[in-house]
């Protein structure tokens, strides 16, 4: 009987023994199930590691899917809806474009792309956000807190080899009017000329789409070295 009561107490006492930042033993064991319980991991992530305790169901899966990315958005902003489209093509610069050359001949029968760039649809996804909450909408803009937190969570969830194109859709009537002394307006994002005037009648369901940039795990880091000794062969 005492053993059963002890098991019940151990099962339901976790909220009482929870420590700030998930530093208690139970939280560390749960974080260890998703690979975040290694000592020193919290210092490598620019967000409280305890946030991932709410994402155990998606983080423990061996694959990364659209439901997991939507869970990240819901955790940060409950009033924001997310739509994930996999295999979103992106332009990739070709290191050696096809050309008429005897040194590096190419064959069009092998599907060789023409031009200086090609399209890659294997390592990038499209994340479309939509919200009618003005507070959350301001937080999603580049440089604000929600945008920064999303990039950090995507780095932990997606890793380094996948990129994501981020876009935000808002109702036009929720944007601030571009007047002096009014709300803050970002040119190219939330600044719409003529908004609020009688000449422009905005529909209830009219929206505007804003590009929020791109999440990229790995960035190119070329190293240019000065050549000191050159041998010319004529």
Regions found by a protein language model. Give the residues of each.
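Feature for intrinsically disordered/low-complexity regulatory segments and propeptides
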Residues: 6-76, 80-103
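C-terminal structured domains
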Residues: 71, 75-234
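Long, hydrophobic/aromatic-enriched structural stretches that serve as scaffold segments
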Residues: 1-5
């Amino acid at each position: 009987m005492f053993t059963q009561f002890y098991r019940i107490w151990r099962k339901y006492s976790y909220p009482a023994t929870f420590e700030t930042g998930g530093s208690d033993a139970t939280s560390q064991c749960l974080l260890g199930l998703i690979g975040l319980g290694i000592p020193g991991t919290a210092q490598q992530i620019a967000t409280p590691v305890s946030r991932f305790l709410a994402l155990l169901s998606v983080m423990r899966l061996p694959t990364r899917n659209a439901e997991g990315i939507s869970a990240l958005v819901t955790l940060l902003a409950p009033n924001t809806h997310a739509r994930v489209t996999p295999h979103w093509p992106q332009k990739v610069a070709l290191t050696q474009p096809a050309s008429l050359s005897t040194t590096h001949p190419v064959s069009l029968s092998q599907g060789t792309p023409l031009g200086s760039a090609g399209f890659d649809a294997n390592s990038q996804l499209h994340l479309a956000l939509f919200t009618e909450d003005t507070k959350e909408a301001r937080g999603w803009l580049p440089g604000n807190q929600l945008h920064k937190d999303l990039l950090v969570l995507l780095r932990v969830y997606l890793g380094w080899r996948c990129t994501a194109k981020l876009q935000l859709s808002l109702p036009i009537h929720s944007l601030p009017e571009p007047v002096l002394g009014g709300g803050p307006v970002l040119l190219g994002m939330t600044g719409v000329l003529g908004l609020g005037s009688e000449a422009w009648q905005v529909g209830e369901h009219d929206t505007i789409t804003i590009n929020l940039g791109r999440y990229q795990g790995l960035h190119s880091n070329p190293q240019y070295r000065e050549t000191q000794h050159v041998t010319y062969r004529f």
